[in-house]
Structure formats: C-alpha cells, structure tokens
C-alpha cells in the first residue's frame, strides 16, 4: 500500500504592485481591489460594489493590516476624490496615518469621532435614499447613469479593529454598523471591518449576517474560524497573508496568498497621489 503525506509548500511572496499593474486590474472600470493570488497563479480581485461589505478576520501576525492597506491602495490607484471617499477608523492611531493628508481619505482615531462618523453616515444614507426615491432611481449606479454630470460618490468605511470600537463605543456602535450593513449598499456606502477577535461578542450575529464577503486569515481556533467564515479551516492557515477568501454569493472559499506591500511602497504611492491632488 501507499502512505500519502501532505507537505506544506513554501509560500512565494506575492507583491501588491504586480497585482496593480496586471491587465485585469488596469482594464476594470469598477471600484476594484486586489485580494491575492491562488496557487495556480491566478490573481483575484473584487469590486466593492459586488462585495457589498467585507469582514476580515485574523490574529496578530496573520497579515490583516497588510490586507487593509492593499484594499485602500487599490482604490486610491483606481478612483479620484470626486468618485469616492475612504473613511479609515484607526483606533491604534499609527497604522493608517500615511493616508491622513489625502483628499480622498479621512482618518479617525478617537472613539468618539468614530461613533460620530458612523452616526453621520447613517444620516447620509437616509439623505441618499430620499434623493434616489425622488429621482426615480433604484440605486447609486442608476442615479449616476442618469445624472452623469453630478454623480453620487461611493463612501467606503474601513474599521481596523472592531473589538476596540465595540468595547469603547457601546451598543450605539453596533446599531450604526448594522444599519449601514443592512441598508447602505444600494446608495453606495460600504463597510470593510477587520478584527483579530472573531468571537460572537465582537462579530455579533447581526453584523456577520450582513457582511457577505469574508476574508479569513490565520485565526486561533476552530470556533474563531466558524465565526469568521461559517466553516473550519482558518485555524490551519500559515499566517503572513495566507487566507481563505469567500466572495459575496460564493458557497466555498478559495485559498489565496495576499499581496505584500512595504512601508516604503505605501509612502511612495501616497507621495505620488499628494503631488497630483
């Protein structure tokens, strides 16, 4: 008889820059973001409009922050401030400071400021739905087709650590997040929420049910993986960008290696954007 032994392969570094110069990214006209590369060499991207909202889970060292940088940089390379605005909630106040002077970005590190931002986005969501209703438009895309000279921009909210926000901001945080997650997609407001603590107390049932796209990096336990992805497997990943990616509408995840981007590369991209704004 034969004995089969599964040997983990060494992970080859995937660079974000290579994904951003790829023709698939360059030729896409949506709000396209680079996710990672599969073992067969295929590159995976997703449009925030199709993703709706994204939940990213991963313990320290899993590559969670790099994934957030990849998504942010993809959007900044793709769209201008008239087309989108990125709100980055950064409780650590260090990870996303690079972007604070860009016209397309607002970085918030104070919890009170973050709660206020989420509340204001709920108000903005209601305002947009009033406009859509009064103009007979079904969603932001039909509105922007009809009023191409004065389009509605997409607002994308990145939350670096949900547990910090939930513990310090109280129930109002969950209430605002759930309202946005349930209703805001059609009017062009999206959430990208990251946590290193995928437990039911942090990623509540209502939040999870309304985050249809999931990225699970290495997590500590099977239970964490079940919260992050609705299935086991995240606990067996290798860290450093090794991920299971479950796009909106898909039943089974694909294993990818997320793109790497250095601090120098981030600074160079931001400097180039600053020059042109």
Identify the role of each PLM range.
Residues 2-6, 14, 19-138, 151-237, ...:
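P-loop NTPase catalytic phosphate-binding loop
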Residues 141:
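Active-site nucleophile elbow and catalytic-triad environment of alpha/beta-hydrolase enzymes
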Residues 144-149:
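Conserved helix/coil segment N-terminal to the catalytic DExD/H
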């Amino acid at each position: 008889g034969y004995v089969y032994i599964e040997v983990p392969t060494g992970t080859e570094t995937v660079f974000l820059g290579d994904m951003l110069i790829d023709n698939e990214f360059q030729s896409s006209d949506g709000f396209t973001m680079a996710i990672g590369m599969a073992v067969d060499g295929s590159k995976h991207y997703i449009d925030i409009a199709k993703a709706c909202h994204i939940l990213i889970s991963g313990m320290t060292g899993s590559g969670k922050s790099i994934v957030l940088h990849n998504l942010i940089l993809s959007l900044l390379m793709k769209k201008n401030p008239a087309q989108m605005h990125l709100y980055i909630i950064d409780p650590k106040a260090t990870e996303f400071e690079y972007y604070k002077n860009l016209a397309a970005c607002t970085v918030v590190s104070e919890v009170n400021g973050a709660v206020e931002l989420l509340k204001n986005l709920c108000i903005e969501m209601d305002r947009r739905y009033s406009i859509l209703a009064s103009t007979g438009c079904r969603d932001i895309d039909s509105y922007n087709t009809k009023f191409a000279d004065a389009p509605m921009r997409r607002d994308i909210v990145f939350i670096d650590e949900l547990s910090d926000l939930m513990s310090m901001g109280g129930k109002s945080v969950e209430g605002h997040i759930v309202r946005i997650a349930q209703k805001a997609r059609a009017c062009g407001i999206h959430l990208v929420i990251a946590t290193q603590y995928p437990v039911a107390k942090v990623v509540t049932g209502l939040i999870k049910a309304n985050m249809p796209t999931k990225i699970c990096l290495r997590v500590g336990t099977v239970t964490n993986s079940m919260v992050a992805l609705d299935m086991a497997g995240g606990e067996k990943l290798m860290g450093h960008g090794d991920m299971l990616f479950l796009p909106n509408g898909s039943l089974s995840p694909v294993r990818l290696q997320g793109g790497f981007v250095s601090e120098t590369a981030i600074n160079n991209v931001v400097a180039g954007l600053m020059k042109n704004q």
